[in-house]
Amino acid sequence: MKFIIGFLLLFAGLKAIGSVPYRFSESPWISESVADEGKYHMPGMKTKPKKYWSCVGVIPVDSRNSVDETDKMRGLQYHLLCQSLAGLTNRAVEKGKSEIAVWLCDHGGKTSYKLSRQALEDMGIHEQGMQNGLELACNEYSSVDGVKVQLKGMFDGYVLTDVKNNPESGVVASVASHVYNSIIVDIRDKEYFEKAGYKMKYDATRKTTVDAWREFRNKCSKRALVIMPVQTGELREFAIKNNLFVLNLNKELGDAGAGQNISLLEEVLTWLEPNAPVYGWEQGVSEDQFVARVSKSGHPMIPCDWSYNHSLLSLLYEKGREQVLPRIFDPRSIDFKKKKNFVSFFLSDGDNIQWMMQDFASRYYDVPEAEDVKMTFGLPVATLAMMAPVQFNNLMGLQKQNCSLMEMLGGGYYYVDTYSQDNNRKTNLRVAAKRLAVSMRQYQIKLLGIMAMDVKSEAAKEAYQVYVDANDQLEGIVVLQYSPYAGGEGEVFWVTNKAGYDIPVITVKYSLWDRIHEREGSPDFIASKLKEEAQEESFSVVCVHAWSRFEGDTYGASAAKRCAERLDDRFEAINMQE
């Protein structure tokens, strides 16, 4: 009843417009001008280079994180070299010491990187050429168009690693690199670089991540943290460019039993600025070992462990650029007299930045089945708009006519009922909600998807109120439970905003998941459960687990369509905003 009253109030406002054609840009619910306060808070690149090198042979080469390669242009050894080259060079641009940047060439041809690279050209930043990391580090080049394009001489030396015998040496070197302004070189290639004139500035071959923290904590920025597994090179460019600390949870790749840096993680999280983002991911460990700790300490996790070029992707993200806004659902199209069992399907894991940069659009989002079931998609609106604004605009432009969008999971991955419970929760939660509200209003996103460990807890309800208080344009919240997603059993909570409107907080009723649970299962199983509970009129939210596969290799929107096709004429699929 409260929801209907809210719509009646909205329609009263529409009617007051009179004979003038109604446009949503005139709606008091939509702000066309949003203050900058709180809008831009993630590390990004603010200085525009004049040119850039494309560094080849890294992305997405299968051997890029192997420690067993002998070729100097293969393996983790080469990967870390190239990441450090890019990070140090891009940092030099930021400091005004260079006009040439480094872009890690995507040999996979992903649309997101193509568009972002084209955006550099559109800004007048032109590719100087394609070279491998060895050439960029060691060759001499003449200036071009008055721009010094040679990288050799820009670095003070090298940091030595032994990634095969000491996995943590690569993590330590990722920090030492920005401290010593030195590229990362492994013992495998030491002789080659010394012949090219490089001198060792720091020996990380026997160092641990704990050693790096003790030695370098005072030389690292508190604005963010990178968590990545040993034996990986991803995100090092970003960490080096922004002077960040890099931490691995497992001391050996994918093996929690070989030792962990849990106490170090907790210490570093306490040291960070409040609400500072934590980038990356860890492998071979349950999320309650690291995401839960990140959340409790008052930081959002940014899943982006298999994405690249974050410095140049984020270039000038805070500057005004043409925005592609979402399709806004017109509530006047609703027949309020219709009696149906309404079902809305939405896709999980929309907080995942790397997924947005890879096959999300082609395999999950821009597909005909999404239109068929009026699918709702969660996007990392607040974070992607800062980290990769070109790809964000691309995704907004690909939105299907009958599909709706929502912010997923509130500016990073965290649990709203545990967020910052170890450190000044009320203040930090309000800051997170305010930042999120500014972003959602700017991009005209009206729905919010969030996650809680216990969706019915008092702490979760406290968070619902904070989000509603921060955003007077919020139309509704959808909340998942960490496990199971449908732990809220479809219960709806009502939260009153500052304007006096009651905003629905809807818990997930069922989820399509390739495992058996009372409220989780195959499309056929969930359809049968919905039919068993059919009434004259009802509303159910069904979350589609992004990584589940069902009979006939159905997944995502095709799995939702399969479920919808097994419902009868008592049901109707609608998008979440509808």
Question: What residues fall within each predicted segment?
Answer:
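Positively charged n-region of N-terminal signal peptides that target proteins for export
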Residues: M1-I4
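Hydrophobic h-region of N-terminal signal peptides that target proteins for export
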Residues: F7-I17
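Preference for solvent-exposed, low-hydrophobicity sequence contexts
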Residues: V20-K319
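Short, glycine/acidic-rich beta->alpha junctions
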Residues: Q260, M387, V431-A432, S457-A460
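Catalytic grooves of carbohydrate-active enzymes
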Residues: S263-G280, V343, S348-D372, A382, ...
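Short, charged/polar "capping" segments at the starts of alpha-helices
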Residues: S286-Q289, A385-M386, E551-Y555
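Active-site beta->alpha N-cap acidic-glycine motif
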Residues: H310-M396
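Substrate-binding cleft of extracellular glycoside hydrolase catalytic domains
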Residues: G378-I445
